[in-house]
Amino acid sequence: MYLSRQLRLLPRANIACSLSSSGAHYTTAAPAEDAPIEIPNRIERSPTDLLQALASTVARDYTAPHYKYHDDPFLIPMSNAAKRTYAMSKESGRKAAKWIKEEHRELFMHQEAQPAIEKFAPSMVYTEDSVVDETSLAQLISQGELKDAVLVYNLLEQKGNPISPELKQSLLELVCFHNNQEPIPEEYIEERWFLQNNKRRERSGKTWKDGDLAEKLYSEIEPKTPQSYASLIRGMAKYLQCERAYALLQEAGEKQVQLDTNTFNSVIEIVSFLKDTAEQRWQLCKDLLNEMSQQKLRPNLGTLNAVLQCISTFGNFKVARAAALQALPEFKQLGVNPSLGSYYYLLIIFCRERGPVSHVIVDILNDISGKEFQIQHPKDTYFFATAMDVCRNHLHDKSLAKKVDELLHTGKNYDLVGDSFKESIYYRNYLALLCQTESTEDFMLSYDLLVPNIYIPEPGIMEEILRAIEINGAVEYVPRLWSDMVVFDHTHRESLLLYVLRILVDNKPNPDSPAQAQLPEQGAKVALDMFERVEEAIKRLRKVSFTGQMLGDILTLLVRGGSYEKATEVFAHIDKNQHRIPGTPSLNALIEFVDASVQEKSPSQALFALQYAVENNFDSRELAKRIHEGFTLNETHLSKLKSLVGESFLDK
């Protein structure tokens, strides 16, 4: 630093002189030769390449939310519903900005950037009076603007302008690909991320629009070309107009029309809709492959995955297994290497719920461990969620699950995790398996890394975690999990509330464990918090409501935690609303409350508990005995005790 500062202070001539003299004295390098400067070819970069390069230099911060959320405690989503709401709200802002740009286009006609950025300018509006030509149509098709392309095509048709067969073919491909429905724009990432879950719920069936523009365009193209056949066949196959797609394929074969490999792939994918039994499906699949061979068509990865998809629909496990073992080596001999989608199909073929146990995932992981993958097939994004499901439900193997997770976090493989639904399934199975197979301390380390910024446990998984904690006797973690349940909005799940209370009541703190020293007080806080939240939920007509068992456990925890005054309030609520509350507290809860009343020298509360027990047909002798022996009762209290249990009991 000192030398650099001194050099900057010297005059330029002195610097040159000093460097040349020192260089002449010390250098041993050969004099530089004039070499031609070669400018490397331009590398195509995406808008986020620089950000990705910077992000790769630092490890992931598990305590921070996803970058799409505001890093602010009040704006970080803490439930799955909030994650979706916050992300879609941000997306709606983009939509609002786009709407303003289109509605008030006169404000956005200027172009500040050089070169101009097309997305910043309002899009062209086409009406019935627009002057259009083939160039306009070609440009819209190249940009994927389906709605405007169809409008311009109709305008050209109405005005009688000729349209070249090549342009009709391009429009046919666009219409067939989208089934003449406007797709979600690429910039709406979050909408596509969350939409997949809704699409999955829709019933799988034919959605192809019969007699629509695609078929009209196809009929206008004369003579029929292989491209026109291919476009319509693929479109019908994609939207499950299966019979007509297969009929068109047969028609093309009869007319000696040479189709391409991807067209055959699309028909192989729908074989399960064309035939019923496994044998019939496998035979049709082989017939299509033989036809490809006769036409000298080389299969590709799409062919392999289409065949495996067909095999995965076989109900007969033995036939499916034999077919998969026959197909995979043949494709490898042809130089077709499987993708993650291929391995996904192998998993669902071999690891069936009602089939024999298969360890095929071990061979798959040995083959692909440590590799980085790129998307090659739409089903590639199904592999990780399915692999983790196999590790948990089929094999129950923690070591395999950790290998899958290591593969997911290799390079950019996380890009292949899929949509929000698949990511949630992946971590649901991963956490459930870890909580069943690891010690509580090790599991909580993984829990801290993943929850809540990467994954928020569903109520079912939270119940699994509570069960594992109960089995391992790690009751000290229950108050913390209750805090998470409050944040994750699980407090309206009655089964979870009862489970938390049961664990705290049934597992008394270990006096020799420092970790459980504060557990009685923490348990009392949990119980009081739960009581107040359920009371609030009842006022708001939420689904959860008090039960006798729940209130009895809350009463017990408050007593054990030294919160006697709050316990009396809870018991007053029990006594006042006993006709509304289903069930009753346990006798042990009443006994502990009476013992606490004895310690607090409150005979009135103890007698209230005894009266409640008598009215609800409990065996009240134990309670009466504790009250009689624990207090020096005055005449009023003694007469009430006699009226409840009788004088004969006191004479014993």
UniProtKB/Swiss-Prot annotation:
It comes from the Eukaryota. It is found in: Mitochondrion. Gene3D superfamilies: Tetratricopeptide repeat domain (1.25.40.10). InterPro entries: Pentatricopeptide_rpt, PTCD3, Rib_mS39_PPR, TPR-like_helical_dom_sf. PPR repeats lie at residues 129-163, 225-259, 260-299, 300-338, 547-581. Belongs to the mitochondrion-specific ribosomal protein mS39 family. This is Small ribosomal subunit protein mS39.
